Amino acid sequence: MEFNIKSGSPEKQRVACVIVGVYESRKLTFAADLLDRISNGFISDVIRHGDMEGKLGSTLVLHSVPHTLCDRVMLVGLGKERDFRAKEYREAVRASVKALTQTSASEAVSYLSELTVKKHDVEWMIEQATVVTLDALYRFDRFKSKQDESVREPRKLTLAVPRRSDLADGEKGLQRGLAIGNGMKLAKDLGNLPGNVCTPSYLGEEARKVAETFGAEAEILGPREIAELGMHSFLSVAKGSAEEARLIVLKHHGAKDKNDKPIVLVGKGITFDSGGISLKPGEGMDEMKYDMCGAATVLGAFRAAVEMNLPLNVIAIVPTCENMPNGNAVKPGDIVTSMSGQTIEILNTDAEGRLILCDALTYAERFSPATVIDVATLTGACVIALGHIATGLYSNQDSLARELLAAGEEVADRAWHMPMWDEYQEMLKSPFADMANIGGRPGGSVTAACFLSRFAKAYDWAHLDIAGTAWKGGKDKGATARPVPLLVQFLQDRADIALGNVVRRGRPRREAPEVADDEQD
């Protein structure tokens, strides 16, 4: 779909649909009020008769509104004005896009992006409208023999800004939103692919395509090179499958000084997780294709960063393989030596994500990173603790944790800081090796993070457990692309710091605009 930024009065838009908002108090937004006045109270009459109450997310499409040039006017409920914040704004935008796909309108102009959201500016409004729109329009129908013709994606969406002087900021927000949306689409596409398509080698080739498209560096290592690095923990998982392992390394040299310490993103890439010899139950095992969503979101965030050409050095590392139970598979009780030299007793082969991540974390040391963030669908225990709302966040630096929490809040991709006290480390003791790969059922998400922390002592490190947030089940089944928005916002914040800018946290914006004659298109 094509996006555009425009400043102009709603009644002068010769387009298939104009989108405006209505509050629950029946108060019209600035753009809706302009349409109401030009139509001699047509919209007010509709509201007065109770056809639109303004409840958040409700929509009503009006045809042939008098004295306007558009074919339709869509009214979107915004809820109570005093409660209208970032969350409500996103919900209203999403509702408008969903309703638009149920019409035959091929073009629309949305004035929701002109609304006032406390502490947020034009750039943020446009960015978020773009991200939400792309997310709402996303469909994964690659393997459908027939397309769903009941949903019609508009050809063009124009997002309105209050004044001509806002066009430049609006364009910045649009480009950021497109980059984030494209990164999310990549993450969702990779996550939704079946395991017989999205194999480790396929993931490696898709990563290479991203690098080639944006001029980044790509290095894809196979089993021989991985073994030469001493990544025997990683390979212990991979050897149970006929699919060969890959270690994907992508590099973006965006900083002025190419020697600046990079930010390293590490993503767990188990393209299918049967559990190995510690076999999972059959029910729901199909969803274990999503066990590579850590890898998918790291690649998605990397794609967004390079598309935005962030002035940072960013490296993505993805260890990827299958966890399968063939005759060569690792067994409970086996002991392996990690790349770091630390030995691991494998008590449960279904705790395999940490076994591939630990070697990737050791590998990251060679880049002398400023920060390392690993992302993984690591533990069911995190789902029990936090449900499907928040990502579990662990870190060896509280300041880094605060940065990530703030980034997540800014873009509605929330995380929660979990404890990682020394007492939990005791649960990983093994009588035969330096550590066991599990610490028992209690505190399973914490002990998994504690395990990883033993391989991340050389740098500032954070771990995002996305087992509860990476995908949805049920009727809305599919990958969510979380935490791509959080990661990209974090990278943008670090880029602002590198440039000496104040970290962008929703700069205050003007109140409802007054549209002057010379500002109308």
From Swiss-Prot:
**Ligand binding (Mn(2+) 1):** 273, 350, 352
Which leading EC class covers this enzyme?
hydrolase
Gene3D superfamilies to which the protein is assigned, alphabetical: Leucine Aminopeptidase, subunit E, domain 1, Zn peptidases
Q: What is the lineage of its organism?
A: Bacteria, Pseudomonadati, Pseudomonadota, Betaproteobacteria, Neisseriales
What's the source species for this entry?
A: Chromobacterium violaceum (strain ATCC 12472 / DSM 30191 / JCM 1249 / CCUG 213 / NBRC 12614 / NCIMB 9131 / NCTC 9757 / MK)
**Gene that this sequence comes from:** pepA
Q: Could you tell me the EC number(s) of this protein?
A: 3.4.11.1, 3.4.11.10
The identity of this protein, by name, is Probable cytosol aminopeptidase
Q: How is the cofactor bound?
A: Binds 2 manganese ions per subunit.
**Primary location group:** cytoplasm
At which positions is Mn(2+) 2 bound? 268, 273, 291, 352
Q: Where in the cell is it found?
A: Cytoplasm
The cofactors required by this protein are: Mn(2+)
Q: Which domain of life is it from?
A: Bacteria
Alphabetized CDD domains for the sequence:
Peptidase_M17 (cd00433)
Q: What does this protein do?
A: Presumably involved in the processing and regular turnover of intracellular proteins. Catalyzes the removal of unsubstituted N-terminal amino acids from various peptides.
